[in-house]
Amino acid sequence: MLGDSRDLFRPKTSDIPAKPGVYKWRDGEGRVIYVGKAKNLRNRLTNYFQPLYLLHPRTQTMVLTARSLEWTVVATELESLTLEYTWIKEFDPRFNVQFRDDKTYPYLAVSTGERIPRVWVTRSRKRRDTRYFGPYAKVWELRHSLDRLLRTFPVRTCTTNVFHKAQLTGRPCLFASIGKCSAPCVNRIEADEHRRLCEQLVGVMTGRLGRPYIAQLTRDMKEASAELEFEKAARLRDQIQMLETVVQQNAVVFDQDVDADVFGFASDELEASVHAFYVRAGSIRGERNWSVERVEDIDDADLMADLLVQVYSDAAGDNHPQSAATISTNREAIGSTQTITATDAVARAQATRERNTRQETTGRADLLAPIAPVPREIIVPVEPARREELEGWLTNLRGGAVTIRVASRGDKKQLMDRANENASQALQRSKMSRISDMGARTQAMNDVAKALGLAEAPLRIECYDISNTVGGAFQVASMVVFEDAIAKKSEYRRFAIRGKDGKGAVDDLSALYETLTRRFKHGNIAGDSGESIDAEQRVASAAGKMTTAVAAETIAANGNDNGEGGSDISGKGHAVPVGVQNDARESPPDIVQQNTNRHHFAYKPNLVVVDGGKPQVMAAAKALEDCGVNDVAVCGLAKRLEEVWVPDDDYPIILKRQSEGMYLLQRVRDESHRFAITYHRQQRRKGALRSALDEIPGIGESYQKRLLNHFGSVKAMREASVEDFEKVKGIGHAKAEALYTALHEQ
């Protein structure tokens, strides 16, 4: 691992206030690389200075890149929420969670503020006094719907310049000639009548006038047919068919007074995806999807809170730029206090009250009033952190009450489940979009080959990482395999580091050397012919126990806690598959024997990647040299600056951060780190359990494994009763009492 640069700017714990606030990390050039908020700054910031192995991989990269830390004290959590989002928008920090769209979504816009309103398709929501419908998933569907609506409601679609030109020349545009515009520019229709057409179009889009209007057209068609006006009847029939299609696309799914945004959520360790349905007046008016990379070890509740802040800050800012949050700051040294005025919603609330008064006076809703970006109700699958503060903030934005809740039953629960399913599918698409793209994968491998000076693209890449606690306890290593730039989890391996004396390696470099030595002395590495081992040769006896020369345990190919395949590699150079007894257990421990059953190691990698800089690369190169392997390239990816190191070079190779090659190396490195730290935590948990159980008579290794699988931790066992212990297979009353007594004495 690289040196810990956090000591250069670590503040005293007593200097950090135990108050709500927002903090900024800056790099060596003064750029803000991360903005965060905290209910208690002291508790939150001290977490960043705990041992590196306890931090999320991306958090490790962030704190090692940082060179200074600043914080700002605020009065309430709501103010920290506002200030954090404002700073994220201002500084665009590279390590912040940013929910991103995979595309720009189209909207149907109606310019309600103009004397002669117009309708058009747009991908922006920044105009005031404009009503927007959407977002829609496909722009061609929206344009098709608008084309059908214009045949029934021929309203203006031209820009202001085109409209004024037609007024001056007295000649309308082509749409007027084909019946898709009523030509208010040349006074073929009065302004009030044209506005009523716009209201009817909006009424169909909102679902308020769709079915009643179709029913009226149907009656008119029948009357025209009865009076033998067949051309009029045919025209009305076509209008009905076109409107039916539009109305079906905006089918009512709830009562007409329901205004809600329904969110779905899906996530894994590295990424999260969110899908939203927008329900207005009881109908689904649009949908949208976001995805985000997990920058640090943040839970789903905090992710959902961040999403709501970003979504509704953007929406409110687009529709009400004059009411954006105002922040007055006194930027001073570290720890400076800043005065904050939260989002000002007075103008927005006043507009809402005026609209409500106008509706009460006229006795009908103002169909052309801009739609509220914040609905009355927000349905989420996970209750967001700081829910009450968010509700208060959203209430100010909307100018009316807003509730956030998790739907438990009914139609809203069904729609939320549908949103969850869409989010899950989007997450899978996002994960596979780059790795499944043959062009991107080929480009990534070619970028790496060009940067490292390889003769051909590295079709098989193996990456190694070391994980341990302070002092070297529970040293483990991971090996992940990527073939054609795709993770091949069935060939992942995990190593328990023993060292020369069986007590572990003296440092990470020795552990890395041991790992690579053991890996490359397995199988047919020397003079590999590339031929796979026959399946019959891979079958071995499952009887008997492993001896002490072999690993303490084996993991089933699909039985580890992550669902990945692979096995543990432990002891003096032996890779142990499931149910295979080591035939070489009588051999002297210093002799590493070839194991022809190790078909997983029968293929050499084209490239070995290690997590670290020049020292780690030199250790890896030395291991390969000692194993007689001279045709495998080696490189290291250093976390802090994402520099690529190769053996015997004094300077690193710099790959473009946005290149496919860098993305591939980062993904390989991060996957290796994740796999290593997961195994390390598992070993620590087992070690803690065994240390507590070793002194209990009659409780050997097999019983310890059963207890671990049943209870999960020593803490849970200390809270268990004698009857709980008896539920474990093979634990009788006497052993249960012995366990209960021993654990409570400890």
From Swiss-Prot:
GO MF assignments: DNA binding; excinuclease ABC activity
Highest taxon in the source lineage: Bacteria
Cellular location(s): Cytoplasm
Ranges where the GIY-YIG domain occurs: 18-97
UVR domain segment(s): 211-246
Gene3D superfamilies: 5' to 3' exonuclease, C-terminal subdomain, GIY-YIG endonuclease, UVR domain, UvrC, RNAse H endonuclease domain
PROSITE patterns in UniProt: GIY_YIG (PS50164), UVR (PS50151), UVRC (PS50165)
One GO term (biological process): SOS response
Entry keyword annotation includes Ribonucleoprotein: no
Predominant location: cytoplasm
Keywords, comma-separated and alphabetical: Cytoplasm, DNA damage, DNA excision, DNA repair, Excision nuclease, SOS response
Keyword Plastid found: no
GO cellular component: cytoplasm; excinuclease repair complex
Ranges for region Disordered: 557-577
Recorded family membership: Belongs to the UvrC family.
Function comment: The UvrABC repair system catalyzes the recognition and processing of DNA lesions. UvrC both incises the 5' and 3' sides of the lesion. The N-terminal half is responsible for the 3' incision and the C-terminal half is responsible for the 5' incision.
Quaternary data: Interacts with UvrB in an incision complex.
Name of this chain's protein: UvrABC system protein C
Organism for this UniProt entry: Bifidobacterium longum (strain DJO10A)
Upper lineage: Bacteria, Bacillati, Actinomycetota, Actinomycetes, Bifidobacteriales
Gene that produces this protein: uvrC
